[in-house]
From Swiss-Prot:
Belongs to the NipSnap family. Pfam families: Hydrolase_6 (PF13344), Hydrolase_like (PF13242), NIPSNAP (PF07978). GO terms for cellular component: mitochondrion. GO terms for molecular function: phosphatase activity. One of its GO terms (biological process) is mitophagy. CDD domains: HAD_PNPase_UmpH-like (cd07532). This is Putative NipSnap protein K02D10.1. Gene3D superfamilies: 3.30.70.100, HAD superfamily/HAD-like.
Length: 526
């Protein structure tokens, strides 16, 4: 596996222009990534450096976006530091004033995008909001829509009012080859604040229009060329001295690669210092302290400090209860859980399951989160040795079991932390015993591959062993049913790029197994 080496000092010496994706790189939701503000300010203070935030979000005006940036603490960034598809598209319309100035554009998009295109692009937009045709229930098909306005272009973007009449109008306008077909970006989904809720993006609207018309659009967002051309015109950047920081392979990294820039992902940023102490850091915090993208530097740190930026510890508790004793076992375990909650509330039971399919049938698996890290692990050891209530409850569980084991694990930084899920799911616990020395290679491959396994919100957690059998990885996936699991896995294989993840990880595996789990009444993961 070939990974280029680069340090912070080399970045500053060899690169003049720094491009950043926004959500997931500089901030997550409404929380700045640790070290991001300091890194941006450091670059802005150097007059020889150019800094740009490249977002694919066209739902906000520039003024609204700047207010968000300032609120997050990035107040040193100015209007000229932010580039969005809406800005690039407006510039395109303005640059072709002989065709578009004062002319109509049919817009499948938001009122904010309309304001940007009209104010900065010099066009007149129509089509936003709910479609004006109210009732299509009197027949099987719509045979006629209002085509009285003749636009010079059709623009597709995110539109919460997207509808069949809009597809029909756009498709009919585009029958005229002189009408240009313009798209802000082709992101099929947007990140959102509610786990499990899929938010269709601009790519969903344009895909429908493209399918009907057979026309290929001109796309203005990452990874397409118009945004790179706009950047060249605005800043006269040298691609060979430009670095693109992003978290999405299909937009950010592809954009950098396609335009001759250095591409960097958060998983690549590692601390070079041998003596630095483990801290809860973001990838930019590590970059500020000195980064490396060279496997030789990984030997200077423990695997856990490279693979996880969380202080949380997790514990897999596996109990093989006696056949026919499941109800009695779960009652005893419930009392044990209550004792633990009372004696140390920061040790939290996240998941609790019994095995429906797998190597061992009469088995329960519980996932505990130690919110204070090793402090909670020490507390658990002490409680099991000295507290009479814990010892009694633990003994009652043990009497119903033939075999028990406890493993300490940490979560990979590129996975989410396990979050509470509503009913009803089946869970697939996959364990992989890796060849010694291959954990970094595994993480590097999966940091890219995980993007292919998130569209159905199936990713629950990914962990690597700290105590117990080492070089073992655990992945937990959630599905609405076994048939849903089958459909989701088939859909993953249809995605270009997933096969590369499999090809890169299978040679690293010594042994693997899958268990299908169903939640108990104690589980937050239902």
């Amino acid at each position: 596996m070939s990974i280029n080496r680069i340090s912070k000092n080399e970045l500053l010496a060899n690169y003049d222009t720094f491009l950043f994706d926004a959500d997931g790189v500089l901030w997550t939701g409404d929380i700045p990534v640790p070290g991001a503000i300091e890194w941006i300010n450091l670059l802005l203070e150097d007059p020889s450096k150019k800094v740009f935030v490249l977002t694919n979000n066209s739902t906000k005006t520039l003024e609204q976006y700047m207010k968000k940036i300032e609120k997050l603490g990035f107040g040193h960034l100015g209007r000229n530091n932010v580039i969005s598809p809406a800005i690039v598209l407006a510039d395109y319309l303005k640059s072709n004033a002989d065709k578009f100035s004062g002319e109509y554009v049919y817009l499948i998009g938001t009122e904010n995008l309309k304001a940007t295109l009209e104010n900065d692009g010099g066009v007149k937009c129509f089509g936003t909001g709910p479609d004006s045709i109210r009732d299509h229930t009197d027949g099987d098909f719509i045979h006629k829509v209002d085509m009285s306005i003749a636009p010079k272009a059709v623009v597709c973007s995110y539109d919460a009012h997207f509808s069949y009449p809009k597809i029909m109008k756009a498709s009919n306008y585009l029958q005229d080859p002189s009408v240009e077909y313009l798209v802000t970006n082709q992101d099929y989904t947007f990140p959102g604040p509610v786990p499990g809720v899929v938010i269709p993006g601009s790519g969903a609207t344009s895909a429908a229009v493209t399918a009907v018309t057979g026309r290929d659009p001109k796309v203005f967002g990452k990874p397409h060329k118009p945004m790179a051309d706009f950047l060249l015109r605005r800043a006269h950047v040298d691609p060979k001295r430009t670095v693109m920081f992003g978290d999405r392979l299909d937009t950010d990294i592809m954009f950098g690669n396609a335009n001759g820039q250095l591409s960097a992902t958060p998983i690549q940023c590692q601390n070079e210092s041998e003596n630095s102490e483990p801290q809860k850091q973001g990838w930019i915090s590590r970059l500020l302290k000195g980064q490396s993208m060279d496997p030789s530097s990984w030997q200077k740190q423990s695997h856990s400090s490279l693979l996880s930026n969380s202080e949380l510890m997790y514990e897999f508790m596996t109990h093989n209860y006696r056949p026919g004793e499941q109800d009695a076992y779960l009652d005893a375990f419930g009392k044990y859980k209550n004792e633990m909650n009372q004696k140390n509330p920061s040790i939290e039971l996240v998941g609790s399951w019994t095995c429906a399919y797998g190597r061992t049938r009469d088995q329960a698996i519980h996932l505990w989160r130690h919110n204070k890290g090793y402090e909670d692990v020490d507390s658990s050891i002490s409680l099991h040795g000295k507290d009479s209530g814990i010892r009694a409850a633990d003994n009652d569980v043990a009497k119903l079991c033939g075999r028990r084991k406890n493993l300490i694990v940490k979560s990979f930084s590129y996975w989410r932390e396990p979050e509470q899920r509503p009913p009803n799911h089946v869970y697939d616990l996959r364990s992989y015993v890796l060849q010694p020395g291959t954990m970094i290679d595994w993480a590097s491959a999966w940091a890219k591959g995980i993007q292919y396994r998130r569209e159905a919100n199936q990713d629950v957690g990914g962990f690597f062993a700290q105590v117990g059998q080492l070089y073992v990885v655990y992945h937990i996936w959630a599905y609405p049913s076994m048939s849903g699991r089958n459909d989701t896995r088939h859909a993953t294989w249809a995605k270009p790029g997933w096969d590369a993840t499999v090809a890169n990880t299978v040679p690293l595996i010594k042994k693997m197994q899958s268990k299908i789990l169903t939640p108990t009444k104690y589980s937050q993961l239902e």
